[in-house]
A protein has these predicted regions:
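Glycine-rich beta-strand-turn "strand-cap" elements at beta-sheet edges
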Residues: 2, 36-45, 71-102
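Short, well-ordered beta-strand segments in beta-rich or mixed alpha/beta enzyme
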Residues: 2-8, 36-63
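Short structured motifs
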Residues: 19, 33-35
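Short, surface-exposed ligand-recognition loops at beta-strand->loop->(often short) alpha-helix junctions
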Residues: 7-18
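Non-catalytic surface loops within mature trypsin-like serine protease
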Residues: 10-12, 55, 89-92
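An amphipathic, aromatic/His-enriched active-site/gating alpha helix that lines ligand/cofactor pockets
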Residues: 24-33, 52-87
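A generic structural motif
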Residues: 13, 32, 42-44
Length: 102
């Protein structure tokens, strides 16, 4: 499995609009096991996006999907900047099957 955790900082006062734009644009994304958008309770303009994919290749391929490209274009004016970004190797959890290591 392949994971990503990233911080986005919305333009001042645009966090909820950014969240609506992102969530409204989520469509069928082959290989996406989990995609969660969360508000940062300590910063009124920050959101965190946590993704779990079956592989890095599925994530890269998703960026070429028309619905994803359209969502990115609609979200760009609402984003002030990007904060931290981390790649992870999810081992499992609620809603995600545990990875079996061989």
């Amino acid at each position: 499995m392949y994971g990503r955790i990233g911080r986005m900082i919305a333009q001042p006062g645009q966090r909820d609009r950014l969240i609506e734009t992102i969530l409204g644009g989520i469509a069928e994304m082959p290989g996406c096991l989990s995609y969660v958008v969360a508000r940062d309770p300590r910063d009124a303009d920050t959101i965190w996006v946590t993704e779990v994919w079956d592989s890095p290749e599925s994530h890269r391929a998703s960026l070429q999907l028309p619905a994803v490209k359209s969502t990115i274009e609609r979200a760009k004016p609402l984003i002030a900047s990007f904060g931290e970004h981390h790649e992870t190797e999810p081992a499992g959890g609620i809603g995600i099957e545990r990875e079996v290591r061989k």
